Amino acid sequence: MEKKWNQLLRGNVLLPLYLLAFLLLFSAANDEKKTTIFIIGDSTAANKDISGGKQERGWGMALQCFFDDNIRVDNHAVNGRSSLSFFNEGRWTKVIEKMKPGDYVIIQFGHNDEKPKADRHTDPGSTFDYMLARYVRETREHGGIPVLMNCVVRRNFFMSVPENDDDEKLRTTTYKDGVKMVEGDSLIDTHGLYRIAPRDVADRMNVHFVDANQLTHDLEQGLGTEASKKLHMWYRPGEEPSVPDGRQDNTHYNIYGAHVVARLLADALCEEIPLLKKYRCVADITVDRQGRGDFMTMEQAIEAAQVKAKQPVTIQVLGGEWKRPSLPKKSNITFVMREGATWK
């Protein structure tokens, strides 16, 4: 009797382990079937620290919101990196190791290649083009599909271009010691040939190209001097709790700006690569605890949806377990639970 009881207990212990192993294998196999969009680049695209309510986001951090669960966005962009330093730090090797045939690699550099530091600097027409071409070539060698993008614009309406040897320093610049210069009505380019070189490389190597510089130029110019500040980490003292002294940062995006730019680039990707159109995801609001969405709490998302009380609103939920909200029977809100997202 004791022997049978021990066998039964052992079976009850092993069954959940077998089930867990099966689920892990199934999940891994399912992930292998998905197409991945890798992103390599700088701080304008990078994932950010979201602790303490920090508002800075890269457009690559928000890109998953605009593609369904058949596409996995794997963002490797890092603050302060150029096409040279990203490669020399071994970050490209990590992307290659994960790449499988049919995956896409978005290659976007330029902001830091123009900086004078030797570990970052490259020259358009020579070393910058060489690095871009190397990423293209090695992506193809591993069965991937390269997509070249030029750099997004800086919000630069200044009558003369302010001196800027490192965009990363902008995070420690408060509003009171920020740039105090007269702004005009026209957005002024700060990238020169660094915005031209990616298109030239794309033409020479027959690579997909998205003109992120022109798209964001038209966006910021269309918004104008004041409204364009809403895209960036531009806050007056006391306006944003995470930067109590304020900030004047014309390079890096806040949550709203990252989503606006990611939406533009997702649409441009689908136009350039029609195969991606069937995976394009459209939702009014995204909530995600990892900071990829418009909001990090369900309460914030619902509050924003209720502002549009007479319009239907779709809230997509990116992963995690959530308490089901109590809503009126005739609510205007529809939820879309993405992969891994469940109600308690």
Where are these regions (language model features)?
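N-terminal secretory signal peptides that target proteins for export/translocation
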Residues: M1-L9
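Alpha-helical cap/lid subdomain in secreted, periplasmic
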Residues: E2-K3, G90-I255, H259, R263-C270
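Bacterial Sec-dependent signal peptides at the C-terminal "C-region" and cleavage site
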Residues: R10-P16, L20-K34
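Serine-esterase "nucleophile elbow" of acetyl-processing enzymes
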Residues: N30-A77, T93-V105
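Short, solvent-exposed loop/turn elements at domain surfaces
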Residues: A45-I50, S83-S85, D294-F295
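N-terminal post-signal-peptidase region of extra-cytosolic proteins
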Residues: E56, S83-K94, G319-G320
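N-terminal extracellular ligand-recognition/capping segment immediately after the signal peptide
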Residues: Q290-E299, A309-K344
